[in-house]
Amino acid sequence: MGTHLLLEVYNVPFEKLNDPQKIEETMVKAVETEDLTILNIFTHQFDPYGVTTLISLAESHLSCHTWPEKGCVAIDIFTCGSKNPRSVASVSYTHLTLPTNREV
């Protein structure tokens, strides 16, 4: 059948979780790492904050829901066949949690 992963990440900066363009770009990058076939993308910005992105895939789906006020993001990935949802989760996690600025 396939593999289903749920990922919840906490303590993510508000600005990273309330930017619909950044969330969508991150999710697209994530599915591209496994050469998954995107069928449709839907992104919605909630008022006053929060973003949901849904990506329909030929191999199944990816969804991302953010709660910036709580610093939380939930990502749901299901892939059929030999595609690896773990690498999709890894890219999503890395892009959403790395600091935007670093001082050395």
Segments and roles (model prediction):
Residues H4-L6, E24, E32:
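N-terminal intrinsically disordered, cationic/polar leader segments
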Residues H61-G81:
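Mid-chain, well-packed structural core segment of small domains
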Residues M1-N18:
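Terminal, regulation- and interaction-focused segments at domain boundaries
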Residues T37, I41-I55:
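Compact, glycine-rich, soluble single-domain proteins
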Residues T94-T100:
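Conserved small/polar residues in nucleotide/adenosyl-binding loops
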